[in-house]
Structure formats: C-alpha cells, structure tokens
Amino acid sequence: MLAMDQGVVEEWLSEFKTLEETAVYNYAVSLKEKGSLVPALYKVIRENYSDLLEPVCHQLFEFYRSGEPRLQRFTLQFLPELVWSYLSVTAARDPHCSGCIEALLLGIYNLEIVDKDGQSKVLSFTIPSLSKPSVYHEPSSIGSLALTEGALANHGLSRVVYSGPHLQRETFTAQNRFEVLTFLLLCYNASLSYMSGSSLQSLCQLSSRVSICGYPRQQVRRYKGISSRLMVTSEFLVQLITGIHFALCNGEVDLGSKALDDVLYRAQLELFPEALLVGNAIKSSLHGASLKSNKEGTRSIQVEITPTASRISRNAVTSLSIRGHRWKRHDAVDLGSPDELTEIAEVDEGICTQASGAQSSPPTIVISSSAGGAAAGAGKLAGKGLRRLTGRSSKEKDKEKDAATGMDQLTRKQAAVRAMSENLELLSLKRLTLTASQSVPKSGSLSLSRTASAVFSRSFEQVSNVFSGNQPSSRASSPTSNHVAEQDEGVAYLDHISPAHQHRQRSPTISIHVTSDL
Amino acid sequence: MTARKSGSRLETEIERCRSEGQWDKIPELVRQLSAKLISNDDLGELLLGEAKLQQYLKENPIKQGSSPRGPRPRLQEVRKHLTAALDRGNLKPEYMQEASLIMAKLCYVEADYREALNQYSRVNLDEMQLVGAPVYRLSMIAEAYATKGLCLEKVPMASPSLSNSIADKDQEIITCYEKSGDIALLYLQEVEKALSAGIQNRSPKPGPVTQEQELGYFLETGLQRAHVIHFKNGNLTRGVGRFREILRAVETRTTQNLRMTIARQLAEILLRGMCEQSYWNPLEDPPNQSPLDDPLRHSPHTKDYALSRRPRIYSGENLFCPQENTEEALLLLLISESMANRDAVLSRIPEHNNDRIISLQSASLVYDLLTIALGRRGQYEMLSECLERAMKFAFEEFHLWFQLALSLMAAGKSARAVKVLKECIRLKPDDPTIPLLAVKLCIGNLHWLEEGERFAKIVIDMGEKAAEFRAKGYLAIGLVYSLKATDASLRGMQEEYQKKALSAFQRAQSLSPTDHLAVFYLALQLAISRQIPEALGYVRQALQLQGDDVHSLHLLALLLSAQKHYHDALNIIEMALSEYPENFILLFTKVKLETLCRGPEEALLSCKRMLQIWKSCYNLTNPSDSGRGSSLLDRAVADRRQLNAMTLPDFSDPETASHASSSLSGSEPVSPLFPLSSLYSPPPPKATESNQRRSSHAFCDHAPHRRFSSASNLPDAFFHGFDSFIGVCSVHATSIAASRVEQALSEVASSLQSSAPKQGPLHPWMTLAQIWLHAAEVYIGMGKAAEATACTQEAANLFPMSHNVLFMKGQVAELRGNVDEAKRWYEEALSISPTHVKTMQRLGLILHQLQRYSLAEKILRDAVQVNSTAHDVWNSLGEVLQAQGNDAAATECFLTALELEASCPILPFTIIPRTL
C-alpha cells in the first residue's frame, strides 16, 4: 500500500478519536469531501495482512455504534468488500487474519437485530389487498377477484414477517454463517440509494466471485483468486440479486449484468428455485429496456409518453369482452342480469375483425345482404358482421373459401336480408344482438352449427356479386352442408360492427334471427 | 359541477355537444341558433371555428413527438371564423376568452408559437374560473395550458446566458403541464359524471354511446409531459410525486389505460430506484434532500401553485397507505395486474397475433415486477397464486410457465410443481435444469421414484449437450437408484439397484471431480453396501473438498463407529457440533455414542442440553403446559442437576404415574394460543433443514420461510423420518403409507383427547418428541422404568399414535416384565407401521419367549426381507431356528449376523438425507 494512502487512513483514524459528541454530526457531513479516504480504506480491507486492518475495523464499528445515520452508511458501504474478505479467508481455511473482520461483521449484526429499546427487531410489512380501499383505488372498480382460498385468506390486510427475530451471535459457525450474512445484506439493501458507485461495484464483484469460484466458469471469467467452491444458500443469493438489480439500473450495467448471469448460473447448478425465480424475472424485465451507463451521479430514468388508448385492436377477444360472448349452445343463452347487459354494451367486445387490420384479408363469413332494393345499401357492409373465431390457421380458411358453395351463401343471405331489413335502423349492435338473443326462446334456434357451416369468401364484394348472380335460391339443403371443417367450439357468431371504426359505415346488425329462421 | 343556467334547450344542447366532442352536430345547431337572434352570430362564428378546428385535428391527429408544420389551407376557414368572432367584439367576456384560446390553439397547429403565447398572455389563463365552468370549458383550459407549455418549449430563450431564467422558464413550463394535467383529470371526471347522468336522464334508446373517449394530443401531453420532463432532469422526487397525483385521482374510463401504465412505471421506479430508507409515503411531503435526485440540479420540491378546483381523489377512512417501497410497489402492481388481466387477448387466430403479443408483453412485465417485489420478501405462496392468474397469457410461453413452476416449488407445492415442470420440459426440451428441478422434487417429500428416474434419464440422454449438468444428472439417477434400493423388498433387487447407484455415482464423480456432493454420495452408497474402508477413503476426499459439510462429517462419524472406533467417532461429532451447534441429527448420534462410550449419565446430559436448545430455538409453548410453567420440560430444563439424579416424585409411584401423566395430558388447553398469524416466525437456526443445501430427509423440504406448510407433507416426512432416528434403517415406501395412517389416527385421537392442538408447523414438535424418546431409551438402558415411562408419556402427549411411541411403550413394558402388555404394544405399533423392523425383532423375541416359534420365525423372516442388514434380526432368527431344531439354517443366520455386526454403525447410514 502506498504511503500516501496509509497516511490518509491514519489521519482519519486519529481524527475521530479526538472528536467530541456534539461534533459528530458535522464530522459525518464532512466525510463526503474526503475523496481519497474511501479508496484507501478499500485497499486496507483487501489486503488482509495490513496492520491497519484492526484499527480500521474497530473505527468502522465505532461509527456504526454511534447511531448517526451518515456514519452508519459510511460503514455499510464497505459491507460487500468485508463479506468477500471473510468468505475468501474461510474458504482458504486461513484461521487467522480474519478475526477483526469477523468481529466487525458480528458487531454490526448484533447491533442491527435489536431496536432502540433493546428488543428483538422483527421486520414485517403489510401485504396490500385489492379488496380494501387504498389511496390509489377503490375495490368496486377493480374487477372481481377470483374466489380462491388464498384470496379469501388475504381478505383484509395482513402483516407478514419477513425477517426476525434473530438471536445474538458471538461467533461465526458454519450453521449461522449465512443467516448472519443474509441479514447483513438485507440491511445493506435497505440503504442502497445511499451507496456510492464503488460500493455497488464491489457488490457485483462479490456476487460474481462467490458464484463462480471453483466452477468451470471461473476459467471463462479468468478470476485467479481462490479456486475452491464457496457454499451459498438460496436466500443469500436472493439478497445479492436484489442488490445487483439496483446496481444494474443505476449505472453499473456491465458489472451488473455479468454478476446477474453468474448468480443465475450458480442458482441453476444448485437448483435453487427462489434465486432462479427472482433472477429470471429481473432478466426478463430488463430485456427490452436499453440501459445505458450513466455518468456517476445522474440517475435519469427514461420515460416516454404512452398513448392512453389501448393498443389492442377492438376485435380481439379479451377477458373482459368474453363475458359478452355468446357461445354456441343449443339452449337459450344465459346472459346474466340486465346490468351486465348494459355493461357489456359499453365494453368493446367483439369479434369483428377489421378489414384493414390484418395482413391478409381475413376470411369473412359474409352473410350479406345485397338483395336488391332497399336493403342493398345497408347490406354492403353487413357481411363484415358475422365472423367466427376459430383456432385454425388462415390456410384452412382459404381452402374453405374455395370450397364455398353458392347455395349456402344464398340461403343465408336471403335470411339475412330479411333480418337486416328489420334491423336496419339499429345502430347499437351489441345491445340489440343481446336483446335479440334473449328474445329468441326457440330451442335449438341458436344452433350456430348452422351458421358455423357458413361459407367463407374473400371479400364482401365478391359475395355480393355472387349473390346477385344467383338469384334462385334453393334453400333446401343449406343446413346440412357443413363445409367448414373447423370445429366450432362454441364460439358465437356475434355480428358486430363497432360504430367508431373508421372504415365502416353504420351498418345494420344481422341478428341471430337469421339462424332461427332457417 | 354546477351547470350554468342556460336559457334554452338549444344552448344546453350546444354545450353538451361541445363537452362530448360531437363536432359534426355543431353546424346544424349553429344554424338553428343563428335563426334565433342576430347577436348570436358571433357565437355562431366561434362555434363553427371551433368545430372545424376540432374536426381537422380529429382527421389529422398530431402524433406525439412531432411538431406542427405550418399553415394549412383548411385552417384558413377556421381563422376566418375566429377572427370574425374576435374582431367584432360583441361576445360576452367568457366567449371572448374561449375564442382567444381557440385562436391560440390554431396558432400552435400552424406553428406560430409566439402568436399563441401572445394570445395566452392576453387572456391570462390563470384567472380563468374553474369553479362553475361548464365541462367543455375545463377541457379548453386544460388544452390551453398544455399548448402554452408546448409553445414555451419550442420558443427559444431570449437570453440564454442567465441560468436562473432557464430554471425559471423550466419551472413555468412544468407548472403549465402540471396544471393542464390536473384540470384534464378534473375534466374527465366531470365528463364521466355527466355522461352517466345523461344516460339515466335520456330515454334508453339505443344511441351510439361513445365508449372510450380519445384524449387527443393536447390533453395527453398535458397529462404526461410533466413527469417526462421531471425524469429527464433527474428530478425523481417530483416525478414520483407527479405519478402519485395522477394515480390518486379517481379513475375514469378514459384514464384506465393511462393509470395502468403509470402504475407500472411507478412500481418500476420504486423497485429499481428506491430503497427502504429513501422512501416517503404518498401522504407525506417529499424529503428535501433525497439521494434519488440529481445532486447537480436544484429544483424546488414543492408545487408553487394551487388550483381552485382539483380532481377528486380517493378518500375515506381507513384508507390503506403504503409505508414501504415494496408495499407501494405491490399495491400498484396488483392494480396494474387486474387491469392487464382484463385485457388478456384470448382469441388465438393469427390475425390477432399482434394484439396477443402486446397484451402478453405488458402483462409479462407486470408479473416480472411482482416476482421481484414478492421475492424480496419471501412471499412465494402469494406469488404462485399471482402467477397462476398469468396463465391466461401463457399458451406456449415458456417464461411464464417456468416462473410458475419455480414459484410452486418455492412455496412447497411439490406435486403441482412437477406437473408444471413437465409442461416446461415440453416447451424447452434442451434445457437440462428443468428435469433436474423435477428430480429434486421427486426425490424429496413426494417420493415419486419412477418419475424421478424418468426425469433423470432425460438429462442423461442429453449427453454432451447438458454440459455442466451431466454430472448432476448422474448424481440424480444415482440417488433415485439408491432410494429404490432401500425400498426394494427382494434382496436381489436391492443388490441390483445398489450396483446401479454405485456406478452412477462413480460416473458423476469422474465427470466432476471437484464436486464434493458426488464424492459424498459415492461414499454414502458404499457405506450402505457395507464397504466401509472404501467409503472412508471417499468421505475423506469429500471433506477435503468441503471441510465443513455437516453430512460428510456425520458420515465419517458413523463409519468410524462401524469400525468400532467409538471415541474417534465421538470426537468427530463434537467437532461437527462446534460448527453446527443446533443440529439435532448430530445430537441424536451423540447421545447414542455417549451411551456406549462414556456412560448413560453423559447421554442424559446431552438430552437435557437438547431440550434446552429446543426451547431456545423454537420459542413455542408446550401443549401440555398448564400455564404455570410446571411441565416436565420446563422443570427439566430449569433443573441444574442431572436428569438421572432428579427425583421425579410424581412418577416414581406406578399408581400416581398414570394419574400424573393424565393430569398432564388432561390439563385444560390453557396454553396461550400462540397466534397463528403472521407474527409467528420460523425458528432461526432452522436446525437441520433449510440453510443446509440438502434439507434433512426427515423434515419438510427446503423452503425456509414457509409459514403455513401444508400439513400433509410434514407428518409424512416426520413419521418415516422418525423411523430412521430410532434406528430403523429403511425409509420405506410402506412407511410412508404408515405415516399417513398415523397422521389420520393422530388427528382423530387429538380431537378426542383434551390436549391442546399444536400450533404452527409440526417439525419442532416432532423434534421434541424424538428428544423425549431418546431420553426414554437411555433410561431403559439404565433400567429406570419410571423415568422411561415419564419420557415416553411426554412424547405420547405430542403424537399419541406414533408407532415409535408405541414401540417405546412396549420396551418399557418389557423392562418391567409385562410381556403380554409389551406384546400388545408391539402389535399396535406394527398395525400402524408394518415394516418397522425393530418392532418386528422385539416381537419376534417375545414370541420366542412365549414359545410360538413358527410365528416368531415368520415375523423375523419378514423383518429380514425389509432390511437385510439388521444383524440383531438375523441373530434372533438364528435363535428361533435353533429352538426349532433347524441348526444348519440357524448357523447360517448367526454367521450372517456376525458379519453384519462387524460393520454395523451406531445408527443406520440411511439417516443421512439423500437429496439433490
């Protein structure tokens, strides 16, 4: 160690000894300005054999004991380095030289496990529950939660203990080693915002080394320190990962990502589910985000203006909208209370696929209208109405298109025309559709299997042409010919054209009267 | 909102259209209006101008991040209208203001920023009334502030040299945006209120209900740009404050999506940028100096304005306000999750692919953040429930499935975890960790050895692709074979499996020579096969690799005891205990060794120490405690004299013994109900489980923070693990069945008895019962029946239907000479656990005494089938055969017994847990 560093450290040692009680606070504030002190102290800790180690450890402990938050944080910043020092010495089975570091670690631990009154500290927190109102929400507006046992048990807020109470420890044994170290890391993580960059770097290095020493990856990382394996526990790794996460997002991108990879590697080898869980989550959540290394001191977070409208197209069936679906059933559909109806009416549900949205023009089941005359104009877009959700690929649908027979189209269209003329002025499709379905009591009338056998055609215009071409209708055999190979798993036909959609004009609904008339 | 008293229906209608954004109706209404009064012409101009501008903006929406380009021909008309309205000056003052605002907006759209700013200064935005303003005007004012902010941003500084003025300008811009955001929120709330009132008022004819209002460029900017600037400037405190303000406002349909995004972003910041010490809760003022902010910029932390009307916020009594960054993050994430769940795209047709991806991505992020927040606090049970809800999104998505599997594993739901892992293997067949995790679970509590073998074979079949996991795969299959060998009932099968296990372990060790686990298990397997010297060599190697591994040390001690070097073994145990002072398995072995080496008094001292340790570890109330601290446990612990010197006056008299014991068991369940609630904390050293990498086979598996362990797992583990402690070597599959029977019986029994039910997880009580039974055994060795009875009774209070307890009762009876009673107890024990070899052996001996030789022979032969290395069984069998006159067979048995006894450890090797 350079003489200069030694001098700095010695000066620091002597300064504090002569300090009075009252001047402690100012001294703490002034510590920040001593730029060369912290690196010098790091050097002392790294070289185990320095004689300054003992007085330094003692002084750091005094800092911690003083209770002044700044001084405590000053001590805490060295924690990763101290832990590494202790672990590496233990692994090398070097009995001496780690005594003072052990004493320091145990001292901090014993101080932290009791609160001001000397009682054992129990760290707990409240698990929020959506069923209780909070400053950010009201329970009624959030949808009903699943009625699981867990949800019932959590009804109301529960305070849960996550650490403690702990026993005082006099020495390190193999049994309590990781309990103590995990708790110390917990304390360290509680003050992460105050830790400087060098401390975070040291944390990342600790994580890397602890994870890979003695494993094949050590060759990859080319770390030449110790070569025997260090035992770790799952909770210890979880606390390390928590710290690494903070470091990753606050400037230490390279070291942090390496450390995270190494810890995950170790967790995989040891089959620790907790560490894998949190590590994978961090990795996946940072996947898209580009983290640039910021300069020291700047902690800017990238935030963009997000569009307030939902980006999901209106046609996609979502959990919310599926409530309003009618399923293929042979009995009357039960749609629940009228309240639900109005709600559904407000919700954008639906299966109307956009003509424009998809890359390939979606196959449409056009039960379209253009019967001549009055219904013609209205019929134009009716076809976009009836669609079907299936799980099959569009290829099959294309095949179906080709196999379309005019007959089916015809029959349906005729019926559709009739229905349409009834419903021409109705603009709120959903409501109507639902009310219509409710008023359809005929059993079996909702056999959408018939509509299921509807024909696909590529475009609405084609169909209307076809339709106008084949006037005579043979209505006979339509229900039977089921061209569609797709099995209809009870997906409803819901004709539905969202009024707000730009590409469509207001179009009439084709209610399921259609099928019932067949 | 108080509606303005409007004179006519027409005006109301106009107001309504303006509020709801139905600009296409305006021209018609204007025509009707101008038919009425001439003076309304100006108003008509104003309305037309506004309508046209709004329609233009609707058709050519300004995108975020782009700047308006310049004058547009279509907007000429608008300008004409507005100029007409303004110039004539006949309008009422409010309408004049409105006209100016619209004019300013037009100027912005045409990129004439200075003019817009002029307009705003003329109007003096700050003085426009919010209270009593009609709904549309709120929107106008909000947009005006936003536009003003935008203009200020775009206009370059007049004199950029003064840094103060830059800061001031920034502050002004931010204030504009913040005001705009607040008023926009207020406007949206008012609109929703009006709409819902309107729906009720009007006849329910189906009219087009504008479901979601589009916010438009200006309102969106106003809502969001403030915090964007805060974050860009590094002012996290104010950014977070702004987020919170937006979230605290009562939600409306239009803001739902925004709230979801903001909630998630705020949760991200709380988890990534804040720690517990730098947190302040939403209801208090932000700290003056926070490490979160950029130290180079000094911006004021408090708002410097106050609006006359504010948006409604969530309020009430007992509102939950988070006190910690994790709590707040959890709350926000739960809110965000419920919203994201609603938007889960369920349809699977390819045209909805993009939608699926979008909803998956946003939900995935929310679930990842939930994992991070809950993982920090060890709440894996809740996490597994949340991740189950994520399954809606998870079709063919490996990440979510895997996370679910891991969370189930961490929460202790092993059976489900294995099933989910199967699905993960299907989704990602090339990843060796997944089958290894499955094997770990199968070998643990579940004891699904067939499945385990299949999973392990998957890893082995991967060959080189598994890279560093190959050794682990061999290790896993070796363990499976080893456990199968222990389970097997035919000797031939046992040997075959043992051979397979050995070769697998050897392969593992050769693949990864620095892994002490492979070497250790090789040693263990050799020990089980009674190849003691080789086992010793390997275990020493293992200790060289990892010097303080508790199981290696234990195995070493057992091996030394097998070689009859009891003192050396005891030394090793004591050394191990110095590193693992609260490890009960080691302590049990110590008791046994001390009984042999140093005499039973020492052993009793150890028992007493164990009781002390137990009491300090598990700070629980003994269920038989009558509340006065007078239980035997407390007295034993408090008594300084050695246990054997203690006179137990209550128990020395056989008559009063039963009375006293019943008084103990019949004591009213006054034990202060240990709150089952969250304040129960798991015992710190967690004795043998948890912090060790391989949790003890006898106890629950590895999740240390599990609070409410599923009751079904533990008793199984206990009861068949308990076997191993008392000396039966097998961890039999049948003993698992026995343990289930015991559990059922004990539940029934405890409901009949009046003893208080045990609180919390069972393993502390199991340990306590084991300690008592060990003490009883030592007393039996000393010949002290009364004390032995007392100890057994203590154990019986805890687990009355345990076959170990029954066995011990039988032994006590034997000691007292009550052969019939002993026989009864043994038979009861066997009915619960038919493969308990020790019981079988003693029963066989009794039957031999009673001269029922053939029955004795049968029972002893069965025992030998179960465990072919039990030398005392062989010995007894030899005696029985001899008594029957079958000398040749008897000789064979005796020889076998001698051989086995030569290498018999003090406790069977199988008490050492075999887990991955």
UniProtKB/Swiss-Prot annotation, chain A:
Keywords: Cell membrane, Cytoplasm, Membrane. One of its GO terms (cellular component) is plasma membrane. Residues 466-484 have a biased composition (Polar residues). Residues 393-403 have a biased composition (Basic and acidic residues). It is found in: Cytoplasm, Cytosol; Cell membrane. InterPro entries: Hyccin (IPR018619). It comes from the Eukaryota. GO terms for biological process: myelination; phosphatidylinositol phosphate biosynthetic process; protein localization to plasma membrane. Residues 385-410, 466-492 are annotated as: Disordered. Component of a complex required to localize phosphatidylinositol 4-kinase (PI4K) to the plasma membrane. The complex acts as a regulator of phosphatidylinositol 4-phosphate (PtdIns(4)P) synthesis. Belongs to the Hyccin family. PANTHER family: HYCCIN (PTHR31220:SF4), HYCCIN RELATED (PTHR31220). Component of a phosphatidylinositol 4-kinase (PI4K) complex. This is Hyccin. The lineage of its organism: Eukaryota, Metazoa, Chordata, Craniata, Vertebrata. The gene is hycc1.
